[in-house]
Amino acid sequence: MRMTRRRTKKTEIRNDSDSVRIDIVIEIVKRLPLKDVSRFLLVSKLWSEIIRSPYFIRSFPFLFSSIQPHLLYALNSLDKDKGHHKCCDIHYVSGLICFGYGQQQLITNPRTGKSIYLPKVKSRSKIIQSFFGYDPVYGQYKVLCMSERMNDYLNVPSSEHQVFTLGGVQKVEQSWRMIECNIHHRPKTNSVCMDGVLYYGAFTGGDMLEWCLMRFDVRTEKLDLVSRLNESSIQCYRPGHSPSLIKYHGKVALAFETSLHTFELWVMEDAEKWSKIRFSICHSMHLFGQDDDDAFLITGNIHTGEIIFAPYDCDVRFGMTHVVYYDLKTNRLRFRTVAFDLGTLFPQISVMVPFFDYVESAMLL
């Protein structure tokens, strides 16, 4: 009996020492610049698991944290071979950016400067719509893609819904997986990801003309319809300026321009109720040297409660762009000029997409 007890005690001590060593490893690596952390992935399997774990990624100290998000611009470049700009879906979530070029999806971490191409999406169609989500529980990023038909087939719903998983503690197959979708719909807006759930606006119904809000649970990979919207009200947006989905005070909102510099926000209170906010910024735009026909897009709101606008178009050769902040309570605008120096890159740049909730990520690609 005594020998058995001693063995048990030694085992417990050995386990305690292992846990201490893991804590030491984490503290050592956290003190290093992120660009040097990747070198330690090859030290051992244990070190690799620690560095790639959601706990380490969340605890890594950064300048740009969720406490004070920063402004990030993503750039879309010119296709030199074809002589025109590539059509690209650009999504940001939890420190990473996803660029969707049809069947090709590129993931990049602005903090590390590293990027990876995912395996090509297998599809009978070359028209691919992509979205990007994050599950904070398992620390996994997922790309959701679906196929579409163009031209005379706008009333045909999307098909071939596929998912690719990045990161997390769970081992997953590094390939695209088909998922089931029983809701006939066709995506119409960008997406927002909140608390592990991805939302996007879409058309549904027999003729694909009825507005709805779709939801993709990043963890369970389940697609369903959250809410249907009043079709007659939504159809009044300004021609050529499609609605966009934004985060508004922790809720999902559909933002669209009814006329130049006049906007509506449809905020989802629950599945059955949407509240409408209508406002105009025409009265102040000229104070900031803006032309009457300068078009701005609602891109979200920040911690102060202000709504953020960014230009639809930006000529990067001027080396600057503008951001407008609007306070609904005080009916006041403030204007910010963002200067940048792209050097020799500017002839290749087509689109600048702003993200106002950027935080850094220690995710190593």
From Swiss-Prot:
- Which residue range or ranges hold the F-box domain? 15-62
The cross-references to Pfam families, in alphabetical order and at most eight, read: F-box (PF00646), FBA_3 (PF08268)
Tell me the protein's name: Putative F-box protein At1g31000
Stored SUPFAM superfamilies: F-box domain, Galactose oxidase, central domain
